[in-house]
Amino acid sequence: MRIDIKDSTMVKPAAETPGGSVWLTNLDLLSPANYHTLSVHFYHHDGSENFFDAAALKEALSRALVDFYPYAGRLKLKDNRLEIDCNGEGVLLVEAESDGALAELGEFAPRPDLNLIPQVDYAKGISTYPLMLFQLTRFKCGGVGLGVANEHHLSDGVAALHFINTWAHLARGVPAPSPPPVFDRRSLSARNPPKPQFSHAEYQPPPTLPTPLTDTAIAYSKLKVTRDQLGALKAKCLAGDPSGKPRSTFEVLAGHIWRCVCAARGLPEDQETKLHIPFDGRAKLRLPPGYFGNAIFFATPVATCGEIESNSLAHAVKRVGDAIARLDEDYLRSSIDFLELQEDISKLAQGAHSFRCPNLWVISWVRLPVYEPDFGWGKAVYMGPWAAPFEGKSYLLPNPDNDGSLFVAITLHTQHMERFEKLFYEI
């Protein structure tokens, strides 16, 4: 399949916007350097003549940037700390065409070889590249892919989707959704003086293998979990838990994935493994509605592979649930203070080294409004990550059919994937 770039436009706010800078919190600064989160929304053609009209989309995007003006800015350093320079330079919108059809993408597994998202040139420095880039790719079947590259220092997925959904509302001629974005980040400032109360294992180096694997080829898989299978997993977990405590869908699936990955990797019983679970702190910290920035913390249970494999599903799920339950307001405030005391927060940034074998990352997009953006021609048939897959990273994704099923998208070493898939369905 071939992708041909037809046009590129730097879209600027439709009206004058505030200047100055947006301060970045310690949580914002945890984002890796030179990194945009990559995802794609796919839409089937609805039969209309003006399907995803580029001019209309640019006009709506320009209007959306009036409220979300920091996206039109650029990164800059001040006193050796990153911030957003609100200079109004704009976001990039690329138009492209493909000689292939959406059906050829099958289950929409990430294809980094297909340029469905604009390439970011990091070589010229942080002040030169856009914080948000979009690509509208038209397929020969009439469908489109909307590729998104979001610079993570400015916003997490919740905030980015707030912006994209606002753009979609304006494109279809309805008022922007409430609430408006809130850029005041003082609610996530460290206390003065900082008072960390915990050791914060989430920011400690992850376990490593004593001898690196020689075969590092990776494979990607997307597995469907039906409503009945979820029910069976929950029942199995409940039957093995003397406390009789019901567990959430996320806790049960994360525990199940952790057990299956540990077994599939075949590591020694005494090998430590760390599970990374991103957690949205907006509710716990009572952040203002519309808070725009990163509010992601981490639950990170650590165990030996032997402990996770040899005990019941209920045990692994309890480890997950206990780690998440620990993230109360006191713990989250302590986390911010802990970061305040670090000389260089960027050294603690999560990345490929954090969740590769023997570790694991499980993130849920199930409650994110990933299927809300409707630009006037219907909702997406699929939305998901499109980056080069990192070994050990997995996503829980909603099913657009809304039938109670979910998808688990995961990347593992090729030598481990077949066994993982077999174990995953042994419910």
From Swiss-Prot:
Temperature dependence: Optimum temperature is 45 degrees Celsius.
A Pfam family reported for this protein in Swiss-Prot or TrEMBL: Transferase
Stretches the record annotates as Disordered: 181-208
pH profile: Optimum pH is 7.1.
UniProt entry keywords in alphabetical sequence: Acyltransferase, Transferase
Keyword Transferase: yes
Active site residues according to the UniProt entry: 152 (proton acceptor), 374 (proton acceptor)
GO molecular function, one term: rosmarinate synthase activity
Classification via Gene3D superfamilies: Chloramphenicol acetyltransferase-like domain (3.30.559.10)
Enzyme nomenclature, EC number: 2.3.1.140
Organism annotation: Melissa officinalis (Lemon balm)
Protein name stated in the entry: Rosmarinate synthase
UniProt keyword annotation of Transmembrane helix present: no
Family: Belongs to the plant acyltransferase family.
Cross-referenced InterPro entries: CAT-like_dom_sf (IPR023213), Plant_Fungal_Acyltransferase (IPR050317)
Substrates-to-products reaction catalysed: (2R)-3-(3,4-dihydroxyphenyl)lactate + (E)-caffeoyl-CoA = (R)-rosmarinate + CoA
Entry function: Catalyzes the formation of rosmarinic acid using caffeoyl-CoA and 3.4-dihydroxyphenyllactate as substrates. Can also use 4-coumaroyl-CoA and 4-hydroxyphenyllactate as substrates. Rosmarinic acid is an ester of caffeic acid and 3,4-dihydroxyphenyllactic acid.
